[in-house]
């Protein structure tokens, strides 16, 4: 009863001396008119956050294409931070499970985190449903997860490649939640050069060695023209019985092979 009686008493905000305002409670207004020169003490609204003062450039070249023997996945291995080459041995093909691969383009931390989270979700799906997740479902799962963070600064452009009941599957997913199915994709700063090679040499009926050579040549051409791509060409092949790592070729060796020049 004592507490109730205290709470029922009105606060003396209009009494002289309260808050040191001499009884003028109207001075508590913190709107634009409360201060001179149109200033305000009100907190800013929750608008679109400002762009960061330092913009870090991302550069890479990744590609994937479907053909009658599966899916070919290839990527360079150079990591850059602006004009600085941070590493020449980055693994840009992420192994989700024995039948699924993902590629890394954009922010390395974003791609690595979300695709490893996807690997966990795919494993949970497999345990619950007693079967492997399809390529389409895995790509949709990733798109739904990153869409919740749209506009919050994520930087990711990935390809989900695999083999399921329907055969080889290939999807492009980015940090905006976009998801596209296709036969050929290339992502990264060197993708324009890789597309030029793939568009000329791609066919669904390629033989295995022809497909390997096309992927190596496309990544090599991108590293030759794009300063943000380089290192080695890591090549994977997704087959009906799972993916295999085919090779890792230094671009200097490929330069001798494809350009015909000598050191």
From Swiss-Prot:
Induction: Down-regulated by IFNG/IFN-gamma (at protein level). Induced in breast cancer tissue. Up-regulated by sulforaphane in breast cancer cells. It comes from Homo sapiens (Human). One of its GO terms (molecular function) is endopeptidase activity. One of its GO terms (biological process) is response to oxidative stress. The keyword Signal does not apply. Changing residue 108 to T: Displays resistance to the bortezomib, a proteasome inhibitor of the chymotrypsin-like activity. Displays high resistance to the bortezomib, a proteasome inhibitor of the chymotrypsin-like activity. The 26S proteasome consists of a 20S proteasome core and two 19S regulatory subunits. The 20S proteasome core is a barrel-shaped complex made of 28 subunits that are arranged in four stacked rings. The two outer rings are each formed by seven alpha subunits, and the two inner rings are formed by seven beta subunits. The proteolytic activity is exerted by three beta-subunits PSMB5, PSMB6 and PSMB7. Directly interacts with POMP. Interacts with ABCB1 and TAP1. (Microbial infection) Interacts with HIV-1 TAT protein. PANTHER family: METALLOPROTEASE TLDD, PROTEASOME SUBUNIT BETA. It holds the Pfam family Proteasome. The keyword Aminoacyl-tRNA synthetase does not apply. This is Proteasome subunit beta type-5. It is found in: Cytoplasm; Nucleus. Belongs to the peptidase T1B family. Component of the 20S core proteasome complex involved in the proteolytic degradation of most intracellular proteins. This complex plays numerous essential roles within the cell by associating with different regulatory particles. Associated with two 19S regulatory particles, forms the 26S proteasome and thus participates in the ATP-dependent degradation of ubiquitinated proteins. GO terms for cellular component: centrosome; cytoplasm; cytosol; extracellular exosome; nucleoplasm; nucleus; proteasome complex; proteasome core complex. The gene is PSMB5. Keywords: Cytoplasm, Host-virus interaction, Hydrolase, Nucleus, Protease, Proteasome, Threonine protease, Zymogen. Its EC number is 3.4.25.1.
């Amino acid at each position: 009863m004592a507490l109730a009686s205290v709470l029922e008493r009105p606060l003396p905000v209009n009494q002289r001396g309260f808050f040191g305002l001499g009884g003028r409670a109207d001075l508590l207004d913190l709107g634009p008119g409360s201060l001179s020169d149109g200033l305000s003490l009100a907190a800013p609204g929750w608008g679109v956050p400002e762009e960061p003062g330092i913009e870090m450039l991302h550069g890479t070249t990744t590609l994937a294409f479907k053909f009658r023997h599966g899916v070919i996945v290839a990527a360079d291995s150079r990591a850059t931070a602006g004009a600085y080459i941070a590493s020449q041995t980055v693994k840009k093909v992420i192994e989700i499970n024995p039948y699924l691969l993902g590629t890394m383009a954009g922010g390395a931390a974003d791609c690595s985190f979300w695709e490893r989270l996807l690997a966990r979700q795919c494993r949970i799906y497999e345990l619950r449903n007693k079967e492997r997740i399809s390529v389409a479902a895995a790509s949709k799962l990733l798109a739904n997860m990153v869409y919740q963070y749209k506009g919050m600064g994520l930087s990711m452009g990935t390809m989900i490649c695999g083999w399921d009941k329907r055969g080889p599957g290939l999807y492009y997913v980015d940090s905006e939640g976009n998801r596209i199915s296709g036969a050929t994709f290339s992502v990264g700063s060197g993708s324009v050069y890789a597309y030029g090679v793939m568009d000329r040499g791609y066919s669904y009926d390629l033989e295995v060695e022809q497909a390997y050579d096309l992927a190596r040549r496309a990544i090599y051409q991108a590293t030759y023209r794009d300063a943000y791509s380089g290192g080695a060409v890591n090549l994977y092949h997704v087959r009906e019985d799972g993916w295999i790592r085919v090779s890792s070729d230094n671009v200097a060796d490929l330069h001798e092979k494809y350009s015909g020049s000598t050191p």
